[in-house]
Amino acid sequence: MADGSVAERAAAPAGGRASGSASHARPRGRARGRGRGRGSLANDGAVDTKAGTSANTAGGAKAKPRDAFFDNAKYLAIVLVAMGHSWEPLRDGSRSAAALYITVYAFHMPAFIIISGYFSRSFDMRKDRLQRLITGVAVPYILFEVAYTFFKRWADDDPHYPISLTDPWYLTWFLLALFIWRLTTPLWKIVRWPVPLALTIAVLASISPDIGDDLDLQRVLQFLPFFVIGLSLKPEHFKLVRRKKARIVSVPVFAGALVFAYWAAPRMNAAWFYHRDAAQELAAPWWSGAVMTLAMFGCSLVLVACFFAWIPGRTMWCTALGAGTLYGYLLHGFLAKGSRFWNWYDVHWIHTPWGAVLLTLAAGTIVTLLCTPPVQRMFRWAMEPKMTWAFKKDPVGMARERT
């Protein structure tokens, strides 16, 4: 993962603010402020030679093989992201769809972010890693923020919708957040209690409505503990949750989560799972922000562990697709938003049980195709540009070239 995706290169988830998801858009300008095979959502810009991912060693040594477990995890997580987006318009008419939506949203982005943090452990301010952070995260963020804005102008008949690199729209928030988290990695590596500190910051953000929308800081700060958790993990921690006992325990845990989500669906504001707002903005008392942040952090960690427990560690047909999750993440958003803009959900049969099943299968199939090598080759110029022309050459490297 270290040199194989957004979380690996440097280390996702229609509509308006009221019903948006963890990757959903919000209106802009609101009053309160505002390498090859590297394209996976959790690996961009870091080189972690301990993780078993592809990273060239000095002297032209062979690259280590990618860890199939993490590629499988990223692929399955991106499938859940796409399915979650397809379920969103079904929630009002189907309590079951709402329960599935809530359950998935409780852990799919935390899982991505934990993996991103895990593959950021070796990140420092070395020149080559900063370059990968820029080309693997910052540049795709700029390109897709502009692309999504033009898409909204055209598809939503909103020709004056503004371009803003400080107010990410829809899916692009994750790239901006990852860029910020990755830059702060050296700080988290020197503090004594990084996870409690990150959790304190998240709690304070959840009770601070004046933070504003710029840089989507609420999400950056409220999701921060998951990234820091990833920085603190070691390979043995992943082995621990993949034991047979963990898989057995995960079954009643997931069943209980679904039952609770079914009960909570008509009673709970799903916006809590998006980590995009302070408690006061959700019409809740300020203290509930702290309570919900801590409670949801614990629940998300448990569900992420249960999710990891069922991830195969062997190479499978989908393992290679894990290197292309960034492509699936960013590209499927055009269809997810377009389906709303073009009123595809107005068709009655989609809101039937069989319609929901077919929609779920379609979402999984589409995002799978978007992760495939042909799509990666087609869009690599935007996702993984080399941009050697933009950086100064290393004097040592230049001397070697002359000799």
Regions found by a protein language model. Give the residues of each.
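Alpha-helical transmembrane segments and their immediate juxtamembrane cytosolic regions
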Residues: 2-30, 37-403
